[in-house]
Regions:
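Flanking scaffold residues of small Cys/His-coordinated metal-binding clusters
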Residues: 1-4, 21-23, 69-70
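Cys/His-rich metal-chelating microdomains
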Residues: 12, 29-34, 81
Length: 133
């Protein structure tokens, strides 16, 4: 499916093709810190399909818990986290932050990882329906 979205202030907009079956929740401590929450929801998109429509994100490189390096992209104006990517395009995909997409209601998590770092009561029961409030 085609997804689009952007930052909170509107300075950065993007479009990409995503597989809604690959939406994931990450419980690593980096994602907890960077999201300001107990976890982050991400959809991987092929780097070739990702297109910046306007704006230029600020990038910085972070070494993850497992030793891998990831570029973190965020809006330089409002600070919205937009995506992560491997340095020099090594992995060929971007981890788009689902909360920045306009289709977030259709990007339902199917998997979760780094569960050993999960906060108490934050593991999502993916196979069970959730109550909408």
């Amino acid at each position: 499916m085609i997804i689009d979205g952007g930052c909170h202030c509107g300075q950065i907009e993007y479009r990409a093709e995503a597989d809604p079956e690959k939406v994931e929740i990450c419980h690593c401590t980096d994602c907890q810190t960077l999201s300001g929450s107990a976890y982050r929801t991400v959809v991987p998109v092929d780097a070739d399909s990702f297109e910046l429509l306007c704006g230029t994100p600020k990038l910085y490189e972070k070494k993850a818990e497992d030793g891998s390096k990831r570029l973190q992209a965020f809006c330089p104006e409002c600070g919205s986290p937009l995506y992560s990517a491997a340095p020099n395009g090594e992995s060929g995909y971007f981890g788009v932050r689902v909360g920045t997409t306009n289709q977030r209601d259709r990007l339902v998590p199917k998997n979760q990882y780094w569960v050993r770092s999960a906060q108490p009561l934050s593991l999502i029961h993916i196979s069970e329906p959730t109550r909408r409030a």
